Amino acid sequence: MGRTWCGMWRRRRPGRRSAVPRWPHLSSQSGVEPPDRWTGTPGWPSRDQEAPGSMMPPAAAQPSAHGALVPPATAHEPVDHPALHWLACCCCLSLPGQLPLAIRLGWDLDLEAGPSSGKLCPRARRWQPLPS
């Protein structure tokens, strides 16, 4: 009887690994420093650095309807209730299956309660609990 070729029997050779790291979370934004050999050629900017002058200027204060200057948006927006946390997470992570649960939580709980112990990051639109 002949054996049928199965891809599961194939073994990878130990020396045939790719030189490109497969951990995209190891970047300058994550705070985890990758080894020097991953950062590119010495003297050249790494792949995580942007060209100088490419960043947007900081947002300036906007004039409001009553003439006073309104400061730019703060880094975090407060969230009124934990039910809104579920709503924000579902919208951010694109989980429509959890959306009815979030709406039900919002109906069952009194949304006029005091502020919760977390804040919503406007950039990521994800719930971030406050450090205790």
UniProtKB/Swiss-Prot annotation:
Keywords: Cytoplasm
Biased composition range(s): Low complexity: 51-65
Cellular localization per UniProt: Cytoplasm
InterPro entries tied to this protein: DUF4620
Known tissue expression: Expressed exclusively in heart.
The keyword Cytoplasm is assigned to this record: yes
Region Disordered, residue ranges: 17-75
Keyword Cytoplasm attributed: yes
Cellular-component GO terms for this entry: cytoplasm
UniProt name for this protein: Uncharacterized protein C11orf21
Native organism: Homo sapiens (Human)
Gene assigned in the entry: C11orf21
